[in-house]
């Protein structure tokens, strides 16, 4: 019997510690999927930030790579299977038809306010 290979996609949490900062909460923390599936990651802000959210991918021992800027704007050179949506406090990063090269940490970053 041949089994479908599975792999893990890990999310990294970005949680500012200073009082008054915008808190971002990502979910799920760990996700196991099969190649070809669609996956979605959520990022929730503690207060409205318009569309000032950016999504990054970081592979093991690699540098962060910007995937989506301002919630839904695509980046040149990033495969079209990556897409973003949302505004205000709720944002989503989706990957259509996941590939093995997508094994990585994914995280959101806000640019509405800085410490």
Curated annotation (Swiss-Prot):
Renumbered residue ranges of the record's region Complementarity-determining-1: 44-54
Entries under InterPro entries matching the protein: Ig-like_dom, Ig-like_dom_sf, Ig-like_fold, Ig_sub, Ig_sub2, Ig_V-set, IgV_Light_Chain
Record keywords, A-Z: Adaptive immunity, Disulfide bond, Immunity, Immunoglobulin, Signal
Positions of region (Complementarity-determining-3): 109-115
GO biological process: adaptive immune response
Complementarity-determining-2, as annotated region: 70-76
Region annotation (Framework-3) ranges: 77-108
Gene3D superfamilies the UniProt entry points to: Immunoglobulins
Region (Framework-2): 55-69
GO cellular component, one term: immunoglobulin complex
Leader sequence residues: 1-20
SUPFAM superfamilies: Immunoglobulin (SSF48726)
Keyword Nucleus attached: no
Region (Framework-1): 21-43
Pfam families documented for this protein: V-set
Disulfide cysteine pairs (residue numbers): 43-108
Miscellaneous: There appears to be two possible splice junctions at the 3' end of the intron. The alternate would code for a protein lacking residues 17-19.
PANTHER family hit by this protein: IMMUNOGLOBULIN LIGHT CHAIN (PTHR23267)
Protein name as it appears in the record: Immunoglobulin kappa variable 5-48
Lineage: Eukaryota, Metazoa, Chordata, Craniata, Vertebrata
Recorded name of the encoding gene: Igkv5-48
